[in-house]
Curated annotation (Swiss-Prot):
Lineage: Eukaryota, Fungi, Dikarya, Ascomycota, Pezizomycotina
Protein name: Catabolic 3-dehydroquinase 1
Quaternary state and interactors: Homododecamer. Adopts a ring-like structure, composed of an arrangement of two hexameric rings stacked on top of one another.
Gene: qutE1
UniProt key word Lyase: yes
PANTHER family: CATABOLIC 3-DEHYDROQUINASE
Amino acid sequence: MGKSILLINGPNLNLLGTREPHIYGNTTLADVEASCKAHAESLGATLATFQSNHEGAIIDRIQAARGNVDGIIINPGAFTHTSVAIRDALLGVGIPFIELHVSNVHAREPWRHHSYFSDKAAGIIVGLGVYGYKVAVEHVALNFKERAAL
């Protein structure tokens, strides 16, 4: 059985490809998701995707992953700087996660420099554009441990 990966994208990431392309590029979220699924499959893993602009929906999806997913890749979007609740959900399910940002948040506004996730993430990918998603999928597929069989 291959690894199971959950890719979560937070607020406004549904606008990838059209929102501030000078920062986020021209690739759509649908293209990112399709590319990530194909890459995961090429590595013997499966990948499920989820995007929401709502904090509670993201928390619900994280909680639903408990016992079903080997690793989470999360681009929390603006929730990076505000959501203790999503952080608590990630810690509560005990699934290792990668924090991902398309842009280099440390080269942007000072308020974007703080993350509620970075100190607990297994890894952080910042500023690689949408290529960062491929890097994250590969890392989880090749390096995270599979959950124990029940």
